[in-house]
UniProtKB/Swiss-Prot annotation:
Residues 27-231 are lumenal. Residues 125-217 are annotated as: Alpha-2. Glycans are attached at N41. It comes from Mus musculus. Pfam families: C1-set, MHC_II_alpha. This is Class II histocompatibility antigen, M alpha chain.
Length: 261
């Protein structure tokens, strides 16, 4: 009897929160900034998630699958992905709505998830990793490696970088954002200076089932260095001068009278 009363109290609290949830969404929609005046159809996605993993709470805001903001719950502030978005990150006035969403999500996970465990199938995504450079590759010039992780669900993972199988430190915190289809994607960035024989790897480990995806990067199609460009220009100039001299010689020879009888 006591157990039934406790379950009823939990469900009653859940119904009350479900009734309040649309009101919190209305506050959020009213404070959503208009970034571009474009008559085409676009999608602004505000996704808050919580889970038994790292990170245990997260919020991402995307525009047509491109992340604009994440949320730092320890500082209670938005974090722009690019400096150009900083002015929109401040003063949105929806901190109370975000706090409500966080509490609601944590309550669902705490009160409802244990009752559904073993009764509904568990979804898993096999992560796919890809590594590429942020700027065109030039040996000896600073650049950034990007590890892009797709098909991520649930969004709990660790990312490790290696150079010639040795761990590399200094990577940026992993950025997670929601995409269409109730899945997530993530980005990890590593600043580096490329050399001709580099071999970098990005290892992505899914915390739930310990599934690991590895992506490798080796230099390909590098732009010519300044020294090589100067050498090629010098060779081209020398060939041009040599061709001019040969042309003049042939012209002079053609003007000489033929020796006859």
């Amino acid at each position: 009897m006591e157990h039934e009363q406790k379950s009823g109290a939990v469900l009653l609290r859940l119904l009350r929160l479900l009734w309040l949830l649309p009101h919190s969404w209305a506050v959020l929609e009213a404070s959503t900034p208009v970034l571009w005046d474009d008559p085409q159809n676009h999608t602004f996605r505000h996704t808050l998630f919580c889970q038994d993993g790292i990170p245990n709470i997260g919020l991402s805001e995307t525009y047509d699958e491109d992340e604009l903001f994440s949320f730092d719950f320890s500082q209670n502030t938005r974090v722009p992905r690019l400096p150009d978005f900083a002015e929109w990150a401040q003063g949105q006035g929806d901190a109370s709505a975000i706090a409500f969403g966080k509490s609601f999500c944590e309550m669902l996970m705490r009160e409802v998830s244990p009752k559904l465990e073993g009764q509904i199938p568990v979804s898993r995504g096999l992560s796919v990793a890809e590594v590429f450079t942020l700027k065109p590759l030039e040996f000896g010039k600073p650049n950034t490696l990007v590890c892009f992780i797709s098909n991520l669900f649930p969004p709990t993972l660790t990312v490790n970088w290696q150079l010639h199988s040795a761990p590399v430190e200094g990577a940026s915190p992993t950025s997670i954002s929601a995409v269409d289809g109730l899945t997530f994607q993530a980005f990890s960035y590593l600043n580096f200076t490329p050399e001709p024989f580099d071999l970098y790897s990005c290892t992505v480990t899914h915390e739930i089932d310990r599934y690991t995806a590895i992506a490798y990067w080796v230099p390909q199609n590098a732009l010519p260095s300044d020294l090589l460009e100067n050498a090629l220009c010098g060779v081209a100039f020398a060939l041009g001068v040599l061709g001019t001299i040969i042309g003049i010689v042939f012209f002079l020879c053609s003007q000489r009278p033929c020796s006859g009888d």
